[in-house]
Amino acid sequence: MSEFIAENRGADAITRPNWSAVFSVAFCVACLIIVEFLPVSLLTPMAQDLGISEGVAGQSVTVTAFVAMFASLFITQTIQATDRRYVVILFAVLLTLSCLLVSFANSFSLLLIGRACLGLALGGFWAMSASLTMRLVPPRTVPKALSVIFGAVSIALVIAAPLGSFLGELIGWRNVFNAAAAMGVLCIFWIIKSLPSLPGEPSHQKQNTFRLLQRPGVMAGMIAIFMSFAGQFAFFTYIRPVYMNLAGFGVDGLTLVLLSFGIASFVGTSLSSFILKRSVKLALAGAPFVLALSALVLTLWGSDKIVATGVAIIWGLTFALIPVGWSTWITRSLADQAEKAGSIQVAVIQLANTCGAAIGGYALDNIGLTSPLMLSGTLMLLTALLVTAKVKMKKS
């Protein structure tokens, strides 16, 4: 695809950035992220309304990640010759449809169908977002355009959980998803208005992505990515029942905790470049080790609200290093195939999200309240050990 983008640049002779299109892509990414994480803050009322356990309701996160995993791997190959403008419009339609299906769901099955639609849009859009952005601006402006995209992601991660918790208490969880559907409609119209025609990739340029896994250290890196994100979702998906039952937070208190977590994540993302300049490998090993210790502290002393709040802030600050760190690892260690490596990374992350949420939900329902924390801490510790022992890092 990178060669195709280069050729396309030459043919189209992009001389000025299309900022309206860039911001429309950023807005769509932000909406997808917000809707992906809404169930985290609405898990309890959703479960009560549908007559299911919180662990089962958490599988609405699982199915989204599961479908997104396959979408990220295969959708760009399936739609090679299709104009990307129409594909992005389709993703925005799927986002809107997902929100409406969830808001009107009267059964767990319909809820899962709605969340599967979101997974298709999420995985496909994430797999294409960077290459889309690169085709909307001149080469010299690509870093700035990408910063807009990832800035939107950071903002979405900050506001998604606390906004969902606050609005859920105010207007009910179904109306929260109705409001998200309205955002989806805005996405559709903005994309139609601003996104130009973007021809698809010629079929003769199709290459085997999975051969990258045969390179030294790459498989170990992908396993480490899997364990770190599975550990994150095993904990974060069930943060509401854990914090409300273990630490005794009410809805208002939980909203503040989630807001603190989101702000800490934003700060961590902002500071990550300074930390990664010193040592990427140290950051990739040190961050999950700190998270493993945090999970242990929360398991032992999480009934204290101050301790629980402190752990949430430390978790947000520390985990923010992990996605940025692994992206940096790809650009350094797999620079010649960064786009394909990024596609595998997205799929691995979505698979990890699926497994983490699924196993965490099973543990919550069948083992106990702190079991998702113990699972998360164990995975984070294993990640730190694997990175230290096996992951290779090329110097910049």
Curated annotation (Swiss-Prot):
The keyword Hydrolase does not apply. Pfam families: MFS_1 (PF07690). Signal peptide: none annotated. Keywords: Antiport, Cell inner membrane, Cell membrane, Membrane, Transmembrane, Transmembrane helix, Transport. Belongs to the major facilitator superfamily. DHA1 family. NepI (TC 2.A.1.2.26) subfamily. Involved in the efflux of purine ribonucleosides, such as inosine and guanosine. This is Purine ribonucleoside efflux pump NepI. The gene is nepI.
